[in-house]
């Protein structure tokens, strides 16, 4: 049998090879292999061989990080060597404004800018309108009838919240943020003893196992399918282990990346409140126009597949140390972005 080229992925050549094999078989003497019936059978056999060969070739390619093409596979291979691809980055800007409290009754002693949306881009920017948010409440005192919010950092994107309840009876439980476009630098995680409790503990992100013990309130991130992220908590050795029925709150910002770079004019869209005698009041008047300190910049797309394939092995080889020129070439971009 002349069928020796197992790497052949050309449909026509596969069909031709099958035809030659059958012609040399004495059981098929005097058959017309160009006839419609046999030709159709050969087409099916060649197509099946082609698909099988293609799948085998792709499976072999996707096993190695330098030849893989699907993002999920590249990310998975990078995860095996401890590399977390850079997420999408939200464009950041700074704004300032003040509130004239002379006509506000009852008179506040402090005013709080609530977390969530704070401003929108004024007009259309590149045929788009952008929302800018903050991750945490900001409280300022009222002095001489004014409350000044100066040089507040705002981030393009919507503030979203995902809640999870930890179950000790489910060893395979996963905490996956359902939205794409998450900026991993703009994530706040807090854990309550249960859903009814108001007492919460803030957890911080950790990228390594150094200086971590069983009581460290830390979490880890890894990218999973469809550019989403999974939150991983400690196991009682490297980081604090969650207790049954712990209620997890994850606040995060999803952004449009580089599309929002360059916005310099903003309109207030936030929520201002103050508390007097245990009652909360909303501030709707006396709010000045927003002044821009720094135009929005720093927005970036999620790390590309080619970049992951380039930097993941090099980050692993450097082992978080900077000794050689290649180490510096690898670590500096990772720290900057």
Explain the meaning of each model-derived region.
Residues 1-337:
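Signature of Asx- and small-polar-rich beta-strand/turn repeats characteristic
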């Amino acid at each position: 049998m002349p069928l020796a080229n197992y790497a052949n992925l050309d449909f026509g050549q596969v069909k031709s090879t099958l035809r030659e094999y059958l012609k040399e078989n004495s059981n098929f003497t005097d058959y017309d292999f160009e006839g419609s019936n046999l030709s159709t059978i050969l087409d099916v056999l060649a197509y099946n061989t082609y698909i099988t060969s293609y799948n085998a070739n792709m499976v072999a390619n996707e096993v190695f990080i330098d030849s893989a093409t699907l993002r999920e596979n590249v990310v998975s291979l990078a995860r095996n060597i401890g590399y977390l691809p850079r997420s999408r980055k939200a464009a950041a800007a700074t704004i300032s404004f003040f509130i004239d409290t002379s006509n506000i009754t009852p008179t506040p002693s402090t005013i709080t800018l609530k977390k969530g949306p704070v401003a929108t881009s004024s007009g259309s920017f590149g045929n788009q309108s952008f929302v800018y948010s903050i991750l945490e409440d900001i409280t300022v005192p009222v002095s001489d009838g004014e409350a000044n919010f100066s040089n507040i950092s705002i981030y393009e994107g919507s503030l979203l919240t995902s809640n999870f309840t930890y179950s000790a009876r489910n060893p395979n439980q996963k905490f996956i943020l359902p939205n794409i476009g998450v900026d991993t630098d703009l994530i706040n995680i807090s854990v309550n003893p249960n859903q009814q409790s108001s007492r919460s503990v803030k957890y911080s992100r950790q990228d390594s196992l150094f200086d971590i013990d069983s009581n460290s309130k830390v979490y880890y991130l890894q990218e999973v399918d469809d550019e989403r992220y999974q939150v991983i908590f400690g196991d009682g050795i490297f980081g604090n282990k969650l207790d049954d029925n712990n209620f997890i709150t994850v606040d995060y910002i999803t952004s449009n990346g580089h599309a929002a770079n360059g916005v310099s004019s903003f309109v207030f869209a936030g929520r201002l409140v103050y508390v007097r005698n245990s009652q909360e009041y909303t501030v709707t008047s006396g709010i000045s126009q927003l002044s821009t300190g720094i135009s929005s910049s720093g927005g970036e797309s999620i790390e590309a597949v080619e970049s992951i394939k380039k930097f993941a092995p090099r980050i692993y080889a450097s082992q978080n140390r900077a000794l050689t020129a290649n180490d510096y070439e690898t670590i500096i971009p990772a720290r900057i972005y």
